[in-house]
Amino acid sequence: MNINFTLISQAMAFAIFIWFTVRFVWPPLMRAIENRQKTIAEGLAAGERGKRELELASQRSGDVVREAKQRASDIIAQAEKRAAEIVDEAKVAAREEGDRILVGAKAEVEQEVFRAKEVLRQQVAGLALAGAAKILRREVDEKAHAELLASLKAEL
């Protein structure tokens, strides 16, 4: 064996191996590496997009929460206002009812006073008649002296 032949055959085998590797092995490896780089780049871009979307969603949720709080405070204010109106309406209604009851009671008292005065007038007229009868020692006829009794009632 000649060392030159061995060296040349090894160099040719190495050259064939390099050619085979460059021709058939290297392109799929490069495609796999490029695909992996694309996947990583897309993942990073998606992560950035997700981060931006998360920030936007956080802002939107904050806006929604603020709006909901504002609406809630508006609703509470309206409810308090309506409650105050209802209380005022109830006070007015109660005052009107009290006034109506007071007017009715005053009218009833006036009627009772009038009735009591009438009863008192009749009793006084009866007493006056009895007193006059005792003074005159005779009985006074009510029919005959109706005019006298009417004027006596009017004076009382």
Curated annotation (Swiss-Prot):
Pfam families documented for this protein: ATP-synt_B
InterPro entries noted in UniProt: ATP_synth_B-like_membr_sf, ATP_synth_b/b'su_bac/chlpt, ATP_synth_F0_bsu_bac, ATP_synthase_B_chain
Transmembrane segments: 5-27
UniProt GO MF annotations: proton-transporting ATP synthase activity, rotational mechanism; proton-transporting ATPase activity, rotational mechanism
GO cellular component, one term: proton-transporting ATP synthase complex
Membrane topology of this protein: Single-pass membrane protein
Keyword line: ATP synthesis, Cell inner membrane, Cell membrane, CF(0), Hydrogen ion transport, Ion transport, Membrane, Transmembrane, Transmembrane helix, Transport
Superkingdom: Bacteria
Described function: F(1)F(0) ATP synthase produces ATP from ADP in the presence of a proton or sodium gradient. F-type ATPases consist of two structural domains, F(1) containing the extramembraneous catalytic core and F(0) containing the membrane proton channel, linked together by a central stalk and a peripheral stalk. During catalysis, ATP synthesis in the catalytic domain of F(1) is coupled via a rotary mechanism of the central stalk subunits to proton translocation. Component of the F(0) channel, it forms part of the peripheral stalk, linking F(1) to F(0).
Quaternary assembly: F-type ATPases have 2 components, F(1) - the catalytic core - and F(0) - the membrane proton channel. F(1) has five subunits: alpha(3), beta(3), gamma(1), delta(1), epsilon(1). F(0) has three main subunits: a(1), b(2) and c(10-14). The alpha and beta chains form an alternating ring which encloses part of the gamma chain. F(1) is attached to F(0) by a central stalk formed by the gamma and epsilon chains, while a peripheral stalk is formed by the delta and b chains.
Name listed for the protein in its UniProt record: ATP synthase subunit b 1
Organism: Nitrosospira multiformis (strain ATCC 25196 / NCIMB 11849 / C 71)
Organism lineage string: Bacteria, Pseudomonadati, Pseudomonadota, Betaproteobacteria, Nitrosomonadales
Gene: atpF1
